[in-house]
Amino acid sequence: MRRSVALLRAAATTVDGSAFAMPPAPGTIQASISGTGAVSATVAVDVRNDGAQWITIETLALSGTTSASSGFAYGARWAECRARVTAISGAGAIVNCVADA
């Protein structure tokens, strides 16, 4: 049974997303950006087991004309995950990030 979690929805500024229970492994995480003209963003994906300290497991660089996407697969499950937009630029640029297992 597949499980999808929206880690970020229409993020238009730098932001730390909320913590979510990580979907079971194996799974994938995909971030995308859309806007007008040249758009770019950097999305960090963090995990933790202790409920306190985050560990960045992947940094996704998104860059394109009107849209771009990047992602990765994971094979280990952590208790929680989140996505963070650490940089974003471009007219009307918004970032989405989804975890799927």
Describe each model-derived feature in a short phrase.
Residues 18-26, 32, 99-101:
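Extracellular and organelle-lumenal recognition/adhesion modules and their flexible linkers in secreted
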Residues 38-55, 95-98:
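Short, surface-exposed beta-strand/strand-loop-strand elements in extracellular ectodomains
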Residues 12, 32, 36-44, 89:
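Solvent-exposed, low-complexity segments and loops of surface/extracellular structural proteins
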Residues 25-33, 74-93:
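Noncatalytic modules at the cell exterior or secretory-pathway interfaces
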Residues 1-13, 98-101:
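Short, intrinsically disordered N-terminal pre-domain segments
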Residues 6-10, 56-65:
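Solvent-exposed serine/threonine-rich low-complexity stretches and specific carbohydrate-binding patches
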Residues 10-24, 48, 70, 92:
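Short Trp-Ser/Thr-centered turn/loop motifs at beta-strand boundaries
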Residues 2, 19, 50-59:
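Tryptophan-centered short beta-strand motifs
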